[in-house]
Amino acid sequence: MTLSTTFREISEIVSNLPVISSHEHHLPDSFHQNLTLDSLLENSYIGWYVGRTKKSIENLTDDSQISVSRKPKIYLLPSDNPQEEPQTLSKQRAEFLDRHGYNSYMVWLERGLQAIYGYEGFLKPENWDSISQQISIRHKNPHAPLEILKQQGKYLHAVQDSYWDYGYDLDHPDFFSPTMRVDMFVTSCHPTLLDHDRNSPFISYPGIPTNNFDDYLDFIKELFINWRQNGAVAMKSASAYERTIQYNEVDYKTAKQLFYKANDEISWEDRIVYGDFMFNWFCGLSRELDVPFQIHTGLAELSGSHPLLFESTIARYPAVQFVLFHSGYPWYSDILGLAHNYDNVFIDMVWAPIISTTGAVDALHQYIEVAQSSDLIGWGSDTWTSEEAVGAVLAWKYVVSKVLAEKIEAGYFDFSKAEVLAQKLMYKNNAALYRFDY
């Protein structure tokens, strides 16, 4: 493919820019110390997509075993059993690469590996073990995960969403600023009710009040205030994985009556009502703590994750800065209606470039044209490992370079404006939103 001179010139500039990520699920250092190509794939989007059965976090005995818990699908990743016959293993790997090597997740993960480990060509059965060995050797250095993010990924900073341990900064507070997740508080009104990550506040915090709803809310408020005082920079909801993101107004009395009802005492409809109250309560807390509220939209429970379902909440809380994640994919054009009409909407293209690179290019073209301000567009990798994060950065930089080059060539703006916009998209917008001093 012949690349235009404009693309090559803008790409050279973009490739050297640092990034700030709005969203990571980066796994602890101890996990990375045992990393291989197989465990990397297991804890990646292609692993989720392929669907190897994984251990749930609540059943683990230590954080070095943390793995992404998702529903199993039909196809499995190649076996990582060292006792497997070499011929069988080679065949499994070849079939895996043939079946999934064209998927955007795999393409960008592989480009991340190439950038870090310097091998030429593509991953294949013949070089699988040697690349895996390189990964293992690199990660014997306990500093490797952050070194890779900073060196190959050009990361300045990242917002960390440790859904297995709310508010956790991975013991790297200078690099990771945590989110304050709301999911289990929205979903669980009793220890018999768990959110999609198998969490409940009544399990995570054994001393949490259960006899009085006011005391319960006070406990949560103090918990979030403490997180905020210790470096948390945003609130985060991924409840779209289990319910609609249309949150109706519910009065306090109704929610109080539903509080601490067990699974066999409460209907699904009443669980939604309770969650509606709690989510609205958190919107008020977000305003009080003066932090943005990150909202998962798209690609979850598809019937309930369309970004337009969230409009009433956006309108209800004009003082809350809502960060709409994932471009609302696959409804990335529809999210523009919200960005056009509401100045408290920040479009975050987190995850989108590795879901569909072509879709992300189309989306960014439109966002630049329609967003109320060029300051209201951002990005995050949304990955578990440094290797996949680097791939996600490369995908984002490709998308930005391609869009800016096409805008320049179309006469939409000139090269100097493109350079300014590139800096905003790479790090300045996120730095301003989360108040990082860069």
Regions found by a protein language model. Give the residues of each.
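Non-membrane alpha-helical structural segments and their capping/turn regions in soluble enzymes
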Residues: 210, 214-217, 225, 272-276, ...
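Catalytic pocket-lining loop regions of alpha/beta-barrel enzymes
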Residues: 244, 258-380, 387-389, 429
